[in-house]
Amino acid sequence: MNIFLDVGAHTGETTKAVLTSKYKFDKIYCFEPQRKIINELRQIESDKVIVNNYGLFNIDCKRDVYSKDVTEGGSIYRDKFKKILFTEKCDFVSASKWFAENIKDEDNVTLKINCEGAECDIMDDLFSSGEYKKVKALMIDFDVRKIKSQSHREQEVREKIKTSNIPLVFMLGSEELNKMTKNETARYFRRRERWVHYWLDKLFNK
């Protein structure tokens, strides 16, 4: 089965773009812990889309998620924001546990992670458990680069990914952003659907 995991689904920007792309998936699992924005995600009309109102992390827990406003994507790391106006207690599930219970070895899994700083916690959990071996394609956005207390982890996880033998990898972090052209940067920050199609092409046309 071809499965897409949208970790840090927000209001469904990536999922909507995946549904309009030339790459076809049997199921799209969305993970979004913030109740304040989950309703928009649930309005996506597709039998393929399964919405989970919890985030993936390295343990099962409840944690505060901080954001600048009620529509902003939030982070479990308070120091991502200079000013916090909204805090919500959210549910999280161990990524390795979820993989073990829901993903089969024969599944063809594409994993997208863009979750405002928790990406390194998730990947470390998948690496330590061995569940990362079920991932055939990975797109990871290193938001830890924006968080002083976590920025050192970007390079650590990069090295693990490089030696992991995950077949297809697209990383977006400090290194890539420094090399991007103005057009690519505009595509990333302003045209989310086009950007998703761009990195899907980068992944699957290697």
Regions found by a protein language model. Name each.
Residues M1-K206:
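Phosphate/nucleotide-binding beta-alpha loop and adjacent structural elements of enzyme active sites
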